[in-house]
Design a protein with these regions (language model features):
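Acidic, proline/glycine-rich low-complexity IDRs
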Residues: 1-82, 86-91, 95-216
């Protein structure tokens, strides 16, 4: 995020009335990570609707032991229902990513980097209407890794349904779409029809691991 505000409490949501969508996301992750009532959180100072640069209203990072489990806030309706789809909330999804605690020294810097990537991808939805679903790939065309130091071999993503699944909120359903880091060679194999997304997911697992080598 371009101007992240770091805090442990979720201040932004408390400034708005009835954050029913936000609370539903919290509840889903609180269930998976009990006792983490105040995870690391990055919020935006100026909301998108008021001219801010970042479409997401926040990103939280839960501690999973050997990984961080990040989740976005803002692709779904966090407060009142605004989207026109009677079944789904907002765009119908939030992004997640499980970042292994390896291959970097500054954890906060890497978490900020993932938050920035989330915003870059979400911007495609907000500006172009592009939707993202499980079992797809995101090819960036870049040659350097997307980690802060650009030392990893991960340049893009495949997607899968997060273990948080799909939740029902007062504003409609929300799918948690997990981004999983993939190498350029792996993504090209998918694009060329040599490998399916699910096949790659079975090979690499669901953690984004900056230290791993390409399986292709």
């Amino acid at each position: 995020m371009s101007t992240p505000e770091e805090y442990t409490g979720k201040k932004n949501k408390d400034e708005m009335p009835d954050p029913v969508g936000w609370d539903a996301i919290d509840a889903a992750f609180d269930k998976m990570y009990p006792g983490q009532d105040n995870p690391i959180h990055f919020g935006t100072l100026i909301p998108w609707r008021l001219g801010g640069p970042d479409p997401l209203q926040g990103v939280s990072a839960y501690d999973g032991g050997d990984y961080f489990h990040l989740v976005t806030y803002g692709l779904s309706d966090l407060y009142e229902k605004e989207g026109g789809d009677p079944e789904y909330s907002g765009y119908g999804l939030e992004f997640t990513l499980k970042l292994r605690k390896a291959g970097y020294e500054d954890e906060m810097s890497e978490l900020k980097c993932i938050a920035s990537i989330f915003n870059d991808v979400a911007r495609l939805t907000f500006e172009n209407g592009e939707q993202f679903y499980p079992d797809e790939y995101i090819y960036t065309g870049q040659e350097l890794g997307f980690d802060r130091q650009q030392k990893s071999k991960l340049t893009g993503f495949i997607t899968a349904l997060d273990e948080a699944g799909t939740i029902d909120t007062p504003n409609g359903k929300v799918d948690f779409v997990k981004l999983i880091g993939a190498t350029d060679a792996e993504l090209k194999a998918i694009m060329e029809g040599k490998l399916r997304v699910r096949e790659l997911a079975e090979k690499i697992g669901d953690l984004t691991d900056y230290t791993r080598e390409s399986v292709i």
